[in-house]
Design a protein with these regions (language model features):
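C-terminal beta-signal and adjacent terminal beta-strands/loops
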Residues: 512-519, 541-594
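Gram-negative outer-membrane beta-barrel transporters
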Residues: 397-401, 418-516
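Outer membrane beta-barrel strand-and-loop segments of large Gram-negative receptors
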Residues: 169, 181-185, 189-191, 237, ...
Length: 594
């Protein structure tokens, strides 16, 4: 459910407009998933093969607020607040083979994972624009954003097959885990805009100013390993409670012991930027934009993780000069061409540069403190054709050269894990994208002053070619880049019928993403591939009158399988590592407007 409202006032003798808007919503949904989890050695030998049933409850809340105030048509102040809260609670039971289980019974066993993820995002934005003179204005603003991520009391329990049923696995196989991630993100900006006279559309201007971003990430985790001293048989998995084994009485009698491990990392990122930019319309057809930006980047990471096995610090200090050029040529009222060239960079994320090892359901993952930022050189050419004001045909060709590309890789260590590496000195990306918005028909409705019967379609598709020579990869001669799907297609068909206060909108949305590399294989591992998926959604809204509306949403109607796979080195056979379906989600809603 959701609620929203707003109001506009006029303040003072100058009738300065003041407005506010508020909205808030709450959703809850439940999921049940059957999934397959496997893993192999580099040769293709399966050492983990488990079937799982996962039950999850997802709760989310959203709140938005906006306040705007205009003064004398010269000054503007606005404040935006956004709060997003998401809570997911899940329990997964997995049966099957795992090399951690006793080999006396073919490494068979049972794993239960209970997990809660509680995340909160709070965004505060204050934006101002001050008209200093008729030609000069000041843009200034600040935002303070907070991310709170909690994983309270995650529990992982492993039971190995035994003669009399099952027994609790010894070692570090019974865990309770608590973690917190706090991110504070402060952004500030101040810039002057001087409008130039071009005697055409009066869009020419010169801009220069400063922006700053200051981010602190603080992560803390506490892990408790419950080491079993005396093993008792559990006859059946159908009716057992771990509280019967892990309780105060058994702890006092040394039935089990508790080992506590603390992990912590801190990542500080400071970016100071100065920029200058000029836009000028030389003729009714030609518009040129030229810019130069200087960024001073300072990143520091301190860590003491993995039970003290990884302890240290590292810094990234970079100075970037980032030029950009954009040209627009208006051939006529319906056709235009754009050319853009720029240099940008990509910084590693906090989780990518901390060597903390996170234990996941499918894979463990660990950051790399020695990562370097990537440099990106971008070029794109775009043609836009507008047959009518509501229709569009657009074609874009693009090229990107990436130096020190950051990619996710698989490391063939004991147990194996996913990490991050500057996988190639340079990588290339090239492709084309097409976008079409077309009205199949637009007809007036008889006996209605305000009526319309409209059928329209939208199509967005792209082909992306990527290649890089990767010395660290198992296949060094050249490979696609991780995460880049060669083919992406989005299609929608929408029917809109309006008659007076009533309206009916029905939309069918089809999305396709082709196979892509999920993780690049190294040290003998082949690449992990993510299978392409085709999804279909249907959304319908019926506005019965100015106060009442009905909404129907049917998501994931095709319910495709999401699969990860990897080929074995010895025979090239494809092994499915993960296989699950998200399920079909159907919801019906009622909206009331006052």
């Amino acid at each position: 459910y959701s609620i929203s409202g707003g109001k506009r006032f006029y303040v003072g003798k100058d009738k300065n407009p003041f407005s506010f808007f508020l909205t808030a919503g709450h959703t809850t949904d439940y999921q049940y998933t059957d999934e397959i989890i496997r893993n192999t050695t580099t040769s293709g030998t399966v050492y983990k093969d488990m079937n799982g049933k996962k039950y999850a409850e997802n709760i989310s809340q959203l709140a938005l607020a906006n306040v705007d105030f205009d003064m004398q048509n010269r000054h503007h102040i606005s404040y935006n607040l956004m709060m997003i809260h998401a809570n997911t609670q899940s329990v997964g039971d997995y049966n099957g083979k795992n090399s951690i289980f006793s080999d006396d019974y073919e490494n068979l066993g049972f794993t239960r994972r209970q997990q809660t993820n509680d995340n909160m995002l709070i965004v505060n934005q204050l934006m101002t624009n001050w008209g200093l003179t008729k030609s000069l204005s000041l843009d200034a603003g600040a935002s303070y954003n907070m991310v709170k991520g909690y994983e309270p009391d995650r529990r992982i329990n492993n039971l190995t097959k035994a003669e009399d049923g099952y027994t609790l696995l010894r070692g570090n196989s019974q865990q309770r885990y608590f973690s917190t991630l706090d991110e504070d993100d402060l952004n500030v900006k101040a810039g002057l805009v001087y409008r130039l006279k071009d005697n055409i559309e009066e869009i020419s201007n010169v801009r220069f100013g400063y922006t700053g971003r200051f981010v602190d990430d603080n992560f803390k985790a506490t892990e408790y390993n419950l080491t079993v001293g005396h093993v008792s048989a559990i006859p059946s998995l159908d009716d057992f409670s771990l509280d019967d084994y892990y309780n105060q009485e058994n702890f006092a009698s040394d039935w089990f012991k508790i080992q506590k491990n603390l992990d912590e990392y801190i990542v500080k990122k400071n970016i100071h930027s100065a920029y200058a930019e000029a836009t000028y319309q030389f003729t009714p057809r030609w518009i040129v934009n030229l810019g130069l930006k200087y960024d001073k980047v300072d990143i520091e990471v301190d860590y003491n993780v993995n039970r003290g096995g990884s302890k240290g610090n590292n810094t990234i200090q970079k100075d970037y000069f980032l030029p950009s050029l954009n040209l627009k040529y208006n051939l006529n009222d319906k056709n235009s061409f754009r050319l853009g060239a720029s240099k940008t960079y990509t910084l590693p994320q906090a989780k990518e540069i901390s060597p903390y090892r996170y234990v996941g359901v499918n894979f463990n993952s660990q950051g790399n403190p020695n990562l370097k930022p990537s440099d990106n050189y971008n070029l794109d050419l775009k043609w836009d054709f507008n047959p009518t004001p509501t229709e569009l045909i657009s074609l874009t060709a693009f090229y990107k050269l990436i130096k020190n590309r950051i990619s996710r890789i698989e490391v063939a260590s004991a147990g194996g894990y996913l990490s991050y590496e500057n996988i190639a000195d340079k990588a290339t990306v090239a492709g084309v994208e097409i976008e079409i918005r077309k009205n199949l028909f637009v007809r007036p409705v008889s006996n209605a002053a305000h009526g319309m019967n409209k059928l329209s379609l939208g199509l967005n598709g792209s082909y992306i070619y990527t290649n890089a020579k990767m010395p660290l990869a198992t296949v060094t001669t050249g490979s696609q880049l991780e995460g880049a799907a060669p083919w992406i297609v989005n299609f929608d068909l929408s029917h809109n019928f309006t008659k007076g206060e009533r309206s009916f909108v029905n939309t069918l949305v089809l999305n396709y993403v082709s196979d892509k590399i999920y993780t690049i294989g190294t040290q003998g591992y082949q690449d992990i591939m993510e299978q392409g998926v085709l999804t279909l959604d249907f959304v319908s809204q019926a506005k019965l009158n100015k106060h009442l509306s009905l909404n129907l949403k049917a998501r994931n109607l095709l319910n495709p399988s999401y699969k990860l796979s990897r080929k074995a080195n010895e025979n090239g056979e494809k092994v499915i590592l993960n296989d699950y379906k998200k399920g079909i989600n159907i919801s019906l809603g009622v909206s009331c407007t006052f």
